[in-house]
């Protein structure tokens, strides 16, 4: 990996990226309300399960294949699979989440003129755009390798989930860092599994997450938008 590639991926995975990731918990807050999360250990287990059982089978392999489509500039496949991913979101708030963050990142890519003009034109035609489609556009624009892209995305997801845990459980900073350290190996395993997953085996089935997210939409008191 080159220094340029590393810096670009650190930028994309940064919580300072202005796409609003901090405002979403992706079901974590609803799981807390349902008493599935009570402390640091159950928070770690919840995040680990989301990474291993959900992201590794769905979002991460989807990222790998969208990245390849951006490199090939297969506009029809990009739009078709982007629509499939949005349709696979289990609740209205999860759909709004990926659409809002995807739109924000696509706008940033356009404003910073990342990528060539032809691919930027394709990016502009995909609406609504899911976050993984916009993320892989940005990664392809910086010539990042698939394993590094998936690792950056997975780490950013784990970090955001941990941040939600710090605010909602609540947990201390050291407890949060212990969660991140504990999941390093799981990130590596999730990336390897995702890279070995063919397009027709991408699976976003997560019924518990869908039910919790739907409940969260009418939850009385909440900090997060999902």
Swiss-Prot record:
InterPro entries (alphabetical): UreF, UreF_sf
GO CC term (a single one): cytoplasm
Swiss-Prot/TrEMBL keywords: Chaperone, Cytoplasm, Nickel insertion
Function in brief: Required for maturation of urease via the functional incorporation of the urease nickel metallocenter.
UniProt subunit comment: UreD, UreF and UreG form a complex that acts as a GTP-hydrolysis-dependent molecular chaperone, activating the urease apoprotein by helping to assemble the nickel containing metallocenter of UreC. The UreE protein probably delivers the nickel.
UniProt similarity note: Belongs to the UreF family.
Protein's UniProt name: Urease accessory protein UreF
Organism whose genome encodes this protein: Burkholderia ambifaria (strain MC40-6)
Gene (UniProt): ureF
